[in-house]
Amino acid sequence: MIAVLGIKRNTPIEIREKLTIKVNKHDEYLDKLLKYLEGVVILATCNRTEIYFNVSSINEELLKKIFEIFNWNYSYRKYIFISEDKKACKHLFEVTCGFHSKILGEDQILGQVKTSYFKSLNAKALNLELQRLFQYAITCGKKFKSQSRLFEIPVSSASIVVNESINKDCKKFMVLGYGDVGRLTMKYLLAHNINEVYLAVRNKKIKDEIMDKRVNVIDFEEKNKYINDMDCVISCTSAPHIVIKKQDINNIGSNIIIYDLAVPRDVDDDINDIDRAQVYNIDNISHINDGNKKMRFDKMDSNKFILEKYLNEYYEWKRLRSIAPFIEELKVTSKEIYNKRITTFKNKCTDKDDVDLANRMIKSTSDYYMNRAIDIMKEETLKGSEEECLRIIKSIFMTKK
C-alpha cells in the first residue's frame, strides 16, 4: 500500500525544526529507507517534511526505524500523521496543487515535488505504483496551475515579506542565503525602488550572476559589519543552527525588521526583546493578509474538479493494473488458437494466396475478439464487477476442451 508520513499541520515551529531533513543527506536517507520500504520519495522543503512510501504494512517498529534514520527523537511521534491508500494519494494531489501550503496557493511546491520525484527516480527508489502516482500528481499540478491561472497572482513567503517591508518604507536590505528562496527574494526586491541590498553568501562567485549596482555581495562571515545599518533583514539559509544571534543586534539604532523564512529557524527568538527589532518567523508570515488570499482561494476552489479528475484516473490505472496478468494470459491463449487454426488450414491447403488470405482473416478475427474481451474486462473492472466478468471470459475463451 501507499502511505505518507508527515508533520501535523498545526505543529509549532519549535517542534517542526526538530523534524527536518538534511538536504545533503537525501541519497543516503533513500538508501537506508529502501531496506524497509518498497519505494520512497522524500519531500523536504523549508516548511514541509513528508515521506511517501510503499510498504506491505505499517507498525510502530517501522516508524521507529524511520525516526532513527532521520535522527528524530521518537518522543515527537505525536506530532506525526500517517495516511494510507486513498487518503495518502489525495494528500499528494492536494499538495501539488498548493492546498496544503503554509501560504495558500504558493507557486513553488510543484517544482519541489518534481525535484523530489526525480531524485528518487534517479536513485532507483521507486516501484511502479509510486512512480505512476507521482506522474499523475505532477501532471495534475501542472494542469491545475495553468487552468486556475494562479500565476496571475503569484505568491510566496518571499513575495509577502518583500511587499510588507516595502509598505513599511524599508530602503536598505540584507538577504542571508542564495538558495531557491534567496534567489526569489532578490528577484522581488530588485523589482522595487530600493536603495541597496547586501547579499550575504558563502560562495562569492555568486557575485558574477548579479549585475545590479544596488547589490553588494559579501562573505557570510561579514554580515555583522553591516546588519545594524539595515532597515530589513530577510534570512533564508539552510543552516541547521541559528545564524543571527541576539548579540548581533545593537540595542541602540533605528528600527529593524527581521524576517526568518527558514526551518530550522535562522534567527534567535530573543532578538524580540530588543526594543528596536521585530522578528517574524514563517508561521507569523503565513498569517499576513497579502490582499489576494481570498482571490486565490476562490480560484483554487472552483478548479478542484481537476484534482478529482486526475485522482480518479490514477485509481482507474491502479484497478486496471490488477487485471494485467489476465490480459497477458488472454493474449497468449489468443496466439495459441490462431497458430493452431492457421497450421490446420496450411495442412489442408497448398495454394499460397489462399493461405495468406486465411492467415490475415484468422488473425484479424482472433485480434478482434481478444481486444473486445479486454475492453469488456476493463469496463467491468471499473464498475467493480471484474470477478464475474473474469469467470465468464475464461469460460468462453480460455477453457480447454
From Swiss-Prot:
Instruction: Tell me the route in metabolism or biology where this protein functions.
Output: Porphyrin-containing compound metabolism; protoporphyrin-IX biosynthesis; 5-aminolevulinate from L-glutamyl-tRNA(Glu): step 1/2
Enzyme active site: C46 (nucleophile)
The Enzyme Commission number assigned here is 1.2.1.70
Gene3D superfamilies per record: Glutamyl-tRNA reductase, N-terminal domain (3.30.460.30), NAD(P)-binding Rossmann-like Domain (3.40.50.720)
Source superkingdom: Bacteria
Instruction: Spell out the molecular function terms from Gene Ontology.
Output: glutamyl-tRNA reductase activity; NADP binding
Which reactions appear under catalytic activity for this entry?
Answer: (S)-4-amino-5-oxopentanoate + tRNA(Glu) + NADP(+) = L-glutamyl-tRNA(Glu) + NADPH + H(+)
Q: Where does substrate bind?
A: T45, C46, N47, R48, S101, E106, D107, Q108, Q112
Alphabetically sorted, this entry's keywords are:
NADP, Oxidoreductase, Porphyrin biosynthesis
Give the GO biological process terms.
protoporphyrinogen IX biosynthetic process from glutamate
Enzyme class of the recorded protein, top EC level: oxidoreductase
- One family from Pfam that matches here is Shikimate_DH
Annotated site (Important for activity), which positions?
Answer: H91
Which InterPro entries would you find in this protein's record? 4pyrrol_synth_GluRdtase (IPR000343), 4pyrrol_synth_GluRdtase_dimer (IPR015896), 4pyrrol_synth_GluRdtase_N (IPR015895), GluRdtase_CS (IPR018214), GluRdtase_N_sf (IPR036343), NAD(P)-bd_dom_sf (IPR036291), Shikm_DH/Glu-tRNA_Rdtase (IPR006151)
Residues recorded as binding NADP(+), renumbered to this chain, are G177, Y178, G179, D180, V181, G182
What does the UniProt record say this protein does? Catalyzes the NADPH-dependent reduction of glutamyl-tRNA(Glu) to glutamate 1-semialdehyde (GSA).
Q: What's the record's remark on domains?
A: Possesses an unusual extended V-shaped dimeric structure with each monomer consisting of three distinct domains arranged along a curved 'spinal' alpha-helix. The N-terminal catalytic domain specifically recognizes the glutamate moiety of the substrate. The second domain is the NADPH-binding domain, and the third C-terminal domain is responsible for dimerization.
- Which protein family is named in the record? Belongs to the glutamyl-tRNA reductase family.
**Binding partners and assembly:** Homodimer.
Add the further remark from the entry: During catalysis, the active site Cys acts as a nucleophile attacking the alpha-carbonyl group of tRNA-bound glutamate with the formation of a thioester intermediate between enzyme and glutamate, and the concomitant release of tRNA(Glu). The thioester intermediate is finally reduced by direct hydride transfer from NADPH, to form the product GSA.
The name of this protein is Glutamyl-tRNA reductase
Which species does this protein come from? Clostridium botulinum (strain Eklund 17B / Type B)
Q: What does the record give as the organism's lineage?
A: Bacteria, Bacillati, Bacillota, Clostridia, Eubacteriales
Gene name of the encoded protein: hemA
